[in-house]
Amino acid sequence: MRFWGSFLLVVILDRISKAWVLASFLPRESRSLIEGGLYLTYVQNRGAAFGLMPGKSWLFFISALLVIMALVIYNWRSKASPLEALSTGLIAGGALGNLIDRYFYGFVIDFIDLGWWPVFNLADSAIVCGGILLLILVLLDGKREERNA
């Protein structure tokens, strides 16, 4: 349930936030939330994370689809811990959010701008947070196995 809960929450919040950006901003329009620190800037990202490899949308679309399918199968077939399910749900939900953008628009809608980092979105944040949590879980599990060996 944690997988599907985090998965659906990420997809829903991502879609709502991007719909608001599309309705409220012109491309490249920026508004300050916290002067010098946080802006909302509408960017059409045609590449991968941070705008890398522009023009390869088909590659990212297929990759995201494979990741989502693998994570759904993993959670369906394994006895993932609640934190594993949460982390993989965040990753899969973020991947689906960006996949939906690529399918309907041919680009990903990015809008969170820290001023010193490439512009990103809620789906990207979910992927990163889920990935970090999963990495921590793997590292902790490895240390536990070393102690038990």
Curated annotation (Swiss-Prot):
Its main location: membrane. This is Lipoprotein signal peptidase. PANTHER family: LIPOPROTEIN SIGNAL PEPTIDASE. The keyword Transmembrane helix applies. GO terms for biological process: proteolysis. Pathway: Protein modification; lipoprotein biosynthesis (signal peptide cleavage). Disulfide bonds: none annotated. The keyword rRNA-binding does not apply. It is a multi-pass membrane protein. It is an enzyme of class 3 (hydrolase). It comes from Syntrophomonas wolfei subsp. wolfei (strain DSM 2245B / Goettingen). It holds the Pfam family Peptidase_A8. It catalyses: Release of signal peptides from bacterial membrane prolipoproteins. Hydrolyzes -Xaa-Yaa-Zaa-|-(S,diacylglyceryl)Cys-, in which Xaa is hydrophobic (preferably Leu), and Yaa (Ala or Ser) and Zaa (Gly or Ala) have small, neutral side chains. It is found in: Cell membrane. GO terms for cellular component: plasma membrane. One of its GO terms (molecular function) is aspartic-type endopeptidase activity. Its EC number is 3.4.23.36. This protein specifically catalyzes the removal of signal peptides from prolipoproteins. Belongs to the peptidase A8 family. The chain crosses the membrane at residues 53-73, 89-109, 119-139. HAMAP family: LspA.
